[in-house]
Swiss-Prot record:
Taxonomic superkingdom: Eukaryota
UniProt membrane topology term: Single-pass type II membrane protein
Residue intervals passing through the bilayer: 93-113
Function noted in UniProt: In neurons, involved in the transport of late endosomes/lysosomes. May be involved in dendrite morphogenesis and maintenance by regulating lysosomal trafficking. May act as a molecular brake for retrograde transport of late endosomes/lysosomes, possibly via its interaction with MAP6. In motoneurons, may mediate the axonal transport of lysosomes and axonal sorting at the initial segment.
Main localization category: membrane
InterPro entries to which the protein is assigned, alphabetical: TMEM106, TMEM106_C, TMEM106_N
Cysteine disulfide links: 210-249
Family named by the database record: Belongs to the TMEM106 family.
UniProt gene name: tmem106b
Name this polypeptide is given: Transmembrane protein 106B
Keywords: Cell membrane, Disulfide bond, Endosome, Glycoprotein, Lysosome, Membrane, Signal-anchor, Transmembrane, Transmembrane helix, Transport
Record's subcellular location: Late endosome membrane; Lysosome membrane; Cell membrane
One BP term from GO: dendrite morphogenesis
Amino acid sequence: MGKALSHVAKHTCHDECQDSLTSSPGYSAMQTDDSKSGGDVSQFPYVEFTGRDSVTCPTCQGTGRIPRGQENQLVALIPYSDQRLRPRRTKLYVMASVILCLLLCTLAVFFLFPRSIDVNYVGVKSVYVSYDQSKRIVYLNVTNSLNITNNNYYSVDVANITARVQFSQTVIGKTRISNITTIGPLDMKQIDYMVPTTIADEMSYMYDYCTLQSIKVHNIVVMMQITVTTVYFGHAEQVSQEMYQYVDCGGNTTALHEYSLNTPLTG
């Protein structure tokens, strides 16, 4: 008897709830909308947009299209784990890029900054002497040595060496050597060059001195002038030196003469 009453009560409540729902204004509005649309879901068919009237859907992984002009009206739903919701750390990347650029610029300036190229005159390496007795001329082939040091972190080319020998305010010999050698980074090379000289004309009196048999050493003082031209990265640099040197005009000499009166640096 109790079960029957419970069932009847539940059925009665169901009918009353349904009547209350159907009589509500919201339900009537929904029924009105359905009646206008015919109650058929075919009013919302699947439409594929192609061509210029559509754009790529940003949340469809490039496989869908949406009508053009509705980009600001449609709302895209993406998963919470999507990469686009994560912070891009733009400031961190920009700061790291700036620090890396500054480091590279500092290294480039350090290694490419031009440093000095040192030229050290070693001395006279050898002297070959010959005479012209009839014309009272003294010929001297003077071979000199230079130490050229490259203090840069890149190679430099020794383009040419210009040398002059001067005796008693008169230039008695000069030479020019081109395309000599290449010096590596932080390296040093010794270069030998020969200057042919002639003592004649108003200095013919030196013939008697150089051929005098009563003395063994016939030293004369000459001024050596050298200009070394180096090239790196298309830039030419010149280093000049002047020094006074003893030269024996009385006979051939093969020993290195390291002594000089002074070695002032002029370039």
